[in-house]
Amino acid sequence: ELLDGASAEFDQELVSKGELSPVFFGSALTNFGVETFLQHFLTMTMPPLPRTADCGVIDPVKEDFSAFVFKIQANMNKNHRDRIAFMRICSGKFEAGMEVKHIQGGKAIRLSQPQQLMAQERKIIEEAYAGDIIGVFDPGIFSIGDTLTTAKDNFEFEGIPTFAPE
């Protein structure tokens, strides 16, 4: 009763537009509501959306690999002074060791030892697809917003939105 009176009716279309946020109640400690959350989460998630570039819209089902760098993090491994560039795959299939064009750098680079990170755990991956986030070693050549692709024609993804501090 309390939930019925305190909330709006669920509308998947509003969730998809980002105008409504679903709220779930549960406890991972007691395993209350976890299964319900996971089942609903799977039905509510959307496939990767097309991303706008200077040449038009890049569809996630396009065969050519493309990605953009959205974060660079240094010193993630205390034993090494590493830098990891996090990128979101926008189209195509990523394969470990593949050669891509770094558009802003103007040259081809090989992306070896790609990683997926979850909290403090790192896992070397062999492949990833549109919508996935991967981390690659950054020898100092990447900047936030950089585009990487295997496409024949060069293009750059539109900039990442920035927000002024409040």
Where are the language model's segments positioned?
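Structural and coupling elements of P-loop NTPases
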Residues: E1-E166
